[in-house]
Amino acid sequence: MVTPADELRCELARAGVRSGDEVIVPSYDVCETAHVVLSVGAEPVFADIDPVTFCLSAASVETAVTDRTAAVVAVHTFGHPADLAALGDVSRRHRVPVLGHGLEAEPTAAIARRRAHAQYLTARLKGVRTPRAQRAAEHGYQKYVVRVPGNGRPDRDAFARALRARGVDCQAPLLTPVHRSAAFRRELRLAETERACDESLALPLAADMTRRELQRVVSACNALGGLLQPAG
């Protein structure tokens, strides 16, 4: 069975990535992408994200390009397509290929139902910052990720504990940016990536959820006012 990692490895090979090259990847991601880059002998270079889409920021990629850059891997995060148009402008200026990665092949009906559920939540949730799709982007909502305003990770974690106590399963989608993980430990400041790790929370969203289950999520969140007393 061909895995997403296998597919990316093949794409890097087709793009001509060789040992000693650099490949720009998001740090707001699982470590697998960076490890695939290492597996072909190249060096992952981490760039920041757009705070709305959680996908690679074209401006950050622009600053990360060097004469060793051989490719950019644009991960489609949580089902939101990366901005391949803006990244394409960077690609043309520097003659560096951009490889889209991470969109899952799913039944159209399941995606449509998730989008309808996401619309329901977005219209009713209060006090949290709900996800927004870029204009013309088709968000697949593989995860429904909100931001908990306040004092970063302490407030996000307290909010999550309070939701779980009310029977709502939720989780931080990413705890540690890849550039700060034990495998890499890069001395690099990626402000939006780090802020997203501290503020973001994935709420339940599945194609087979009922309206009653969705309303339970809304009621639990809104009962907290969307924001707990900021942590000390």
Task: Label every model-predicted segment.
Residues E7, E11, T33, F159:
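Conserved sugar-transfer catalytic core signal across GT-A, GT-B, and GT-C glycosyltransferases
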Residues A5-E22:
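ANL superfamily AMP-binding
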Residues E7, T53-F54, P81, V178-R180:
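Short secondary-structure capping/turn micro-motifs that flank functional sites
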Residues M1-L8, Y28:
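Conserved N-terminal alpha-helix of the aminotransferase class I/II PLP-enzyme fold
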Residues V17-T77, P81-G100:
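PLP-dependent aminotransferase-like
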Residues L103:
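Conserved Walker B
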Residues A59, A71-V75, L84-A86, R93, ...:
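PLP-dependent aminotransferase class I/II
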